[in-house]
């Protein structure tokens, strides 16, 4: 009798334990499934973000290439001395864009090249692609290796400043074909920067040059008009502090 009683109690204890272990196994399985679902969803989200970024970068590259190639074609038709490099996004002027030794202004041919290229750059900036990606034009003046670093730095700054002055100074011959609206756009788009003798060419003559470097917005950059500098309209005639050869 006692043996049967103990046997019943033992079976009841076993029967009470079985559902507990089954529920624990089910819980672990459910947690594993949940973990896999979360992991798959996370990987899918990351993959989609990468694909969107790659597609955005591809679209950006295509837009910039289309803009630059169109600018290159127009420049070639207007003035053969204007060289548009769509690989480095640079505009140079060959021998017309070279400075004499220790001088910071271009000759008549170089001024003519500037006069021809500026409307083309402004047109590119106002294009559909330009409105999305065109950030600014950096005017870079280069020197040869003669003289000290600081001397050449000052000279390169003068050269890039002179190019900017030739676009905005009221005494410059280039002013004849630049409207007040274009002047305002030049002030927003163009930036003068000195480079000294970095990126020297094969000869000293070729090193003494000016180039225009096109910069474009990246995917993460936001072209917010609220952040743009609001330049006042030109009331008085702009006068450069450098000597402007007439």
Swiss-Prot record:
GO CC aspect terms: plasma membrane
Consequence of gene loss (knockout): When this gene is missing the Zorya system does not confer resistance to SECphi27 in E.coli.
Record localization: Cell inner membrane
Domain of life: Bacteria
InterPro entries cross-referenced by the UniProt entry: Bact_OuterMem_StrucFunc, MotB-like_N_dom, OmpA-like, OmpA-like_sf, ZorB-like_t1
UniProt keyword list: Antiviral defense, Cell inner membrane, Cell membrane, Membrane, Transmembrane, Transmembrane helix
Outcome, altering residue 26 to N: No longer resistant to SECphi27
PROSITE patterns: OMPA_2
Residue span(s) of domain OmpA-like: 86-218
Main location: membrane
Pfam families for this protein: MotB_plug
GO terms under biological process: defense response to virus
Membrane topology classification: Single-pass membrane protein
Transmembrane regions: 20-40
Purpose: Component of antiviral defense system Zorya type I, composed of ZorA, ZorB, ZorC and ZorD. Expression of Zorya type I in E.coli (strain MG1655) confers 10,000-fold resistance to phage SECphi27, 100-fold resistance to lambda, and 10-fold resistance to T7. While most T7 infected Zorya-containing cells undergo abortive infection, a minority produce viable phage progeny. These eventually accumulate to a high multiplicity of infection, leading to culture collapse by 2 hours after initial infection. ZorA and ZorB probably assemble in the cell inner membrane and exert their effect there.
Family, as annotated: Belongs to the MotB family.
Designated name of the protein: Zorya protein ZorB
Gene: zorB
């Amino acid at each position: 009798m006692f043996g049967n009683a103990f046997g019943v109690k033992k079976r009841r204890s076993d029967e009470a334990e079985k559902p507990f272990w089954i529920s624990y196994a089910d819980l672990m399985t459910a947690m594993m499934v949940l973990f896999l679902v979360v992991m798959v969803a996370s990987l899918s989200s990351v993959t989609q973000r990468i694909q969107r970024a790659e597609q955005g970068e591809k679209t950006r590259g295509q837009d910039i290439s289309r803009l630059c190639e169109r600018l290159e074609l127009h420049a070639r038709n207007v003035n053969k001395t204007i060289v548009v490099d769509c690989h480095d996004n640079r505009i140079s002027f060959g021998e017309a864009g070279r400075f004499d030794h220790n001088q910071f202004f271009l000759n008549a041919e170089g001024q003519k090249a500037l006069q021809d290229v500026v409307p083309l750059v402004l047109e590119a900036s106002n294009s559909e692609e330009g409105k999305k990606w065109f950030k600014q034009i950096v005017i870079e003046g280069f020197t040869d290796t003669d003289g000290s670093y600081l001397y050449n730095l000052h000279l390169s700054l003068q050269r890039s400043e002179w190019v900017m002055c030739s676009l905005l100074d009221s005494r410059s011959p280039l002013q004849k074909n630049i409207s007040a609206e274009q002047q305002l756009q030049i002030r927003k788009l163009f930036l003068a920067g000195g480079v000294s003798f970095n990126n020297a060419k094969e000869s000293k003559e070729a090193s003494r040059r000016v180039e225009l470097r096109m910069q474009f917005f990246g995917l993460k950059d936001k072209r917010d008009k609220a952040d743009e500098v609001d330049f006042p309209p030109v009331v008085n005639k702009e006068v450069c502090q450098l000597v402007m050869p007439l």
